[in-house]
Amino acid sequence: MPEKKRVAIIGCGRMGQHYAGAYDMFEDTEIVAIAEYNDARRKVVGERFGVTALYKDANELFKDIVPDLAAVILPGKYIKEAVIAAAEAGVKGVSSDKPIAATLHDADEMVNICEARGVIFHGGNLQRASHEIQETANRLRQGWYGKILGATLHAWGSSEISGGGCQELAVLRLLTSAEVTEVISWAGPQDALESDSDEGLFVHALFRMSNGLECPVSAHSIGFGGLDIWTENTLIRCKGPKVEMFQGFDGDGKRTQVDPRFSDFPWPRFNYLGSSIRSLISAVDHGSEMAISGHDLRQSLEIAIAAKYSALWGSVPVKLPLADRSLTLYPHTYRWLGGDQSGNPQTVEEARSRSLQN
């Protein structure tokens, strides 16, 4: 059996513990170090996963250990420093999580430093890594369903266009094999629009895509939220990580739902966290395309910022890529500062016994 990948977990809050649980279960990975600022949680999570190399932060960890992989699962404010520390330490691959940053310049810096050092920069636990979405994307590329004629997005981000909405944006770009090149938007309420955060901001928009498609975007649900893509006789509906398929029409002209017959997923316990991690390992080992990359998270941030500023400036069409890389959009406080700093701290008892769930 090949030598196990040595993994460092940077940040062991609730989501970091999910990552640790997955890496602990895979046969070809082992957790060799943990960095966690909370002293009590660091101790109990180390005990839970049998890890004795415990550190306060990423910089302290990398002075002693250079693992193969580093999983950065920190509140948004602290992601950049840890990702860059991992790249400069010489890891083979580093994963982040959502949202990658608040400012485009910070996202650019992470992407550029990893690229310059030959470090795989993976995106983390995002729905785009779902095996159903990845299999659908492969089928679309192979022409199974014909030419894409349209796309639409409902309930974008559920009032968090960056912190939550990065999910749908990454899937939209994947399934259409296209980039968003122009955004025009309408948003409210006004106080949310004028703030520096996406918290409570509802956005309606029109995205122009590099392949000629126009994608209408609604802030609200119409009984479901998610992404619809259609061809001449097929409608593909993405609801989070799950995909529904409609092909052909009945006698009344109504679409007929069919079984997409996706292949079996080898790690159902881990859902798209599992497929995301396997994608990172494959990229490190074989140079294969990542299911979700740091670049993808940067693109999602850029689209969200463009939508916010288009509305703020009076529904002005905004071209992408944005020239001003200092533009900023903070996520909700709990995403930016973490649960401990936003009124939802994790107890030691929960950290000691928390079961793995996605």
Segments (PLM) and residue ranges:
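N-terminal Rossmann-like dinucleotide-binding module
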Residues: 1-49
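Beta-loop-alpha module in the N-terminal Rossmann-like domain of NAD(P)-dependent dehydrogenases
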Residues: 19, 49-114
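Glycine- and charged-residue-rich phosphate/anionic-cofactor binding loop of Rossmann-like
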Residues: 30-33, 283-298
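Aromatic/hydrophobic pocket-lining residues that form π-stacking "cages" and hydrophobic walls in ligand
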Residues: 42, 82, 110, 136, ...
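A contiguous active-site-proximal alpha/beta segment in oxidoreductase catalytic domains
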Residues: 69, 95, 100-160
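A contiguous, mid-protein "functional segment" used to position or interact
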Residues: 74, 290-332
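Rossmann-like dinucleotide-binding domain that binds NAD(P)(H)
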Residues: 149-224, 228, 295
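NAD(P)-dinucleotide binding in Rossmann-like oxidoreductases
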Residues: 193-198, 210-276, 293, 307, ...
